[in-house]
Each structure stands twice: as C-alpha cells, then as structure tokens.
Amino acid sequence: MKKALKTAARGTVFPYAAEKWVVLEHDPAGRTLCLRLEVIPDKPFDEDNRNNFAISSSKEWMNGPYLDNLIDAVKGPHAFLQTELDLTADDGLKDYGTCTVTIFSLTVDQYRRNRDVIPLVDDWYWLSTAYSTAANGYEHSARCVWDVGALTGLGAYRGLSGLRPACYLDSDLLISVEDGDEDTGVGPQEAGTIVAELVEQFGGTYATGEQFAAEVSFLLGKLRAIREKEAAHE
C-alpha cells in the first residue's frame, strides 16, 4: 500500500533506496527522522580515535560512498534532506558545536526520545554524541548502544561497534508499507478521542473487558480508514 510518509506511525518499517528504515518522528518542518533497520557491523566511530563526529571517518563515509549508493538506488530525485546536527556532549559541553550532514548517527537525545520504537538488534552501534570533549580531557570516548538497547561508551577507534545510519526524509515521500509493518498509529490525540468516545458510550461506567476490547477495535478501525482516505488524497 502506498501512503505519504507523514501519515506513517512511529515504528513503521518501510523500504527506500534499497534499504529498510524505521519511522522515528515527524517534525513541523515537513521532515521525518528515520533510522536504518539493521546495523552495518564493524565500523569505528573514527579511525583516528577522535570523538568529534564533525571530523570523524564515520561521518565522511556515511555522507560519501554510503550516501552515493543510496542516491543511486533511488534512480531519480531523492528525498534525503540535509540537517544541522547538534553535537553537544553527553555531559552538556558544547565545544563540538554542530555539523551539516545528510546521513548521520543518532544523537543521544534523538535516541532517548525514540527508544520506545527503535527495534533491538544483535550488534552494538555508535551514536554521534561524545562522552565529553577533548578540552575536558576526553577526546576518545563516544556513546554507543548495546544490543539490549542500553547506552555505554567506547574508544572511538574500536570496530567492535557498527553504524546504524539515520536521516531526515521529506515527509511528502510516498512509501510502500506491508501488512504488519505498521503499528496502530494511535498517538496521544487519537488516544484521547478513543477514551472520550468510550466514556460517552458507556456513560462513565466500567465496561466489561470484552465490551472495552470490542469498542476499541471498532474505533481503531475507524481511525485506520480515515488515515487511508487522507493518504489516498495526498
């Protein structure tokens, strides 16, 4: 089924540029933050053991050969957008500033904000956030994610971790979503609507579990139908 990326729920998996991506979040600027479904293993943060993502070998590779391959796979105009990445260190130091990128490793803040919809993988992978900065005596250690989803830090030269590229895509991009690759798409606003309708339906009294489940199923069906109609008119 084809639909606009901006209508896809957080956690939706979809193919683009010969890769599979996970929808993390939509922003008001018409962009969607996406994360590669799988890790590219055995890639250091930086071959020279520097924890500043702006000058790292991983940034150069992701925005060089890797991005070139993605664009070639699209075979036409692409939806990858440049962004200004905040390189504030994990301890709050802002020595490393920002950098302009198209493909990047998630920051710690982006990871934490979207941890609930990021699938676990068997490999460790880098984030773009430094543990601290060179001026504070920490020029080598960068943050990374364990296979269980917890955060840790490693020396930037280590190939023990891999890369899990992220990007911003134009939210108007039409994507294909297979059955089972999208969750219900119910956010806080939709959830509030469901609760309000349930209260009205049952007069503020407690329903049985079966009644509640049946009513929620019906309302979710209505929401899906509305979303599909909206996508069809994009």
Predicted features and spans:
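Short intrinsically disordered terminal tails
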Residues: 1, 228-234
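Collagenous Gly-X-Y triple-helix signature in extracellular proteins
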Residues: 1-196, 200, 204, 225
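Intrinsic low-complexity, intrinsically disordered segments enriched in polar/basic residues
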Residues: 124-127, 216, 230-232
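Generic L/I/V-rich hydrophobic alpha-helical segments across diverse proteins
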Residues: 195, 213-216, 220-223
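N-terminal regions of proteins, emphasizing targeting and processing segments when present
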Residues: 198-199, 220, 230
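Charged, low-complexity interaction regions
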Residues: 203-212
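N-terminal processing/targeting junctions
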Residues: 212, 226-229
